[in-house]
Amino acid sequence: MAQYKGTMREAGRAMHLLKKRERQREQMEVLKQRIAEETILKSQVDKRFSAHYDAVEAELKSSTVGLVTLNDMKARQEALVRERERQLAKRQHLEEQRLQQERQREQEQRRERKRKISCLSFALDDLDDQADAAEARRAGNLGKNPDVDTSFLPDRDREEEENRLREELRQEWEAQREKVKDEEMEVTFSYWDGSGHRRTVRVRKGNTVQQFLKKALQGLRKDFLELRSAGVEQLMFIKEDLILPHYHTFYDFIIARARGKSGPLFSFDVHDDVRLLSDATMEKDESHAGKVVLRSWYEKNKHIFPASRWEAYDPEKKWDKYTIR
């Protein structure tokens, strides 16, 4: 059998190198496991935040039955958003606590390994100290390289500047949006009871459909007896064959460039309905006059044209192709 013929010092050094490689391998495994856990956590957080507003929208639809006022709709939406954000923050806090506990356990394990290693001979301890000092010097020298890109590292000043710019842009956008909402526009409509009675009314772009109907009703009551005892909740506004909810604003349709079956909702210049013209082969840029009808009239005549074409407005449904059927 072959025997090792080196000195005791060389044997001790060989043993020290073997133990050092074993420690490095264990540290590498711990680091890989930590990176994998943090990656999984980040992907879970991203998924939760991407589904946040979809979940709020679904909850809002399921909890809203019938016609509601604009204030009620906004209050429900804000309450759902706050509750959803609170749940997400609580989950994230629990996940961070779990990761912190795991890091503490890893630190305790490393301290335990160091305590066991300290039981070795003084010669091996000296070699360990020298090796650790050399590694620390090398790491320190590498960390001070001025040519290394550190833009990805946390920087409080840079983050504060970015937050300030982001807030300025948000305020500027809010001011621009409020300015657009405050602009006046003229809406041409027909009170529809089987035939059209053309009227116009001026509203702000930030007004809701309900506010528009209230203003239109004031002008129609003196000419139509059936409207003198009617309330706004008994009226419907049909635009491009879509029944528009009372809580939507004209700004919503304009900014979304929404379309109906027979034309755009956002453009309120009016022309004659192409279905009443001899040539309906080309779409015009303007939109048709909307129709204001009593809900009772619609229920009695919804199987007859043109009411048979009408359907509830759905922001998720796209009418990319022009249709007059």
Curated annotation (Swiss-Prot):
Gene Ontology CC terms:
intercellular bridge; midbody; nucleoplasm; nucleus
Q: In which tissues is it expressed?
A: Widely expressed. Mostly abundant in testis and adult and fetal brain.
* N-acetylalanine sites (modified residues): 2
Q: Per its UniProt entry, which superkingdom is the organism in?
A: Eukaryota
Instruction: Quote the PANTHER family the UniProt record gives.
Output: PROTEIN FAM50B, XAP-5 PROTEIN-RELATED
**What family is this?**
Belongs to the FAM50 family.
Protein name (record): Protein FAM50B
Species per Swiss-Prot/TrEMBL record: Homo sapiens
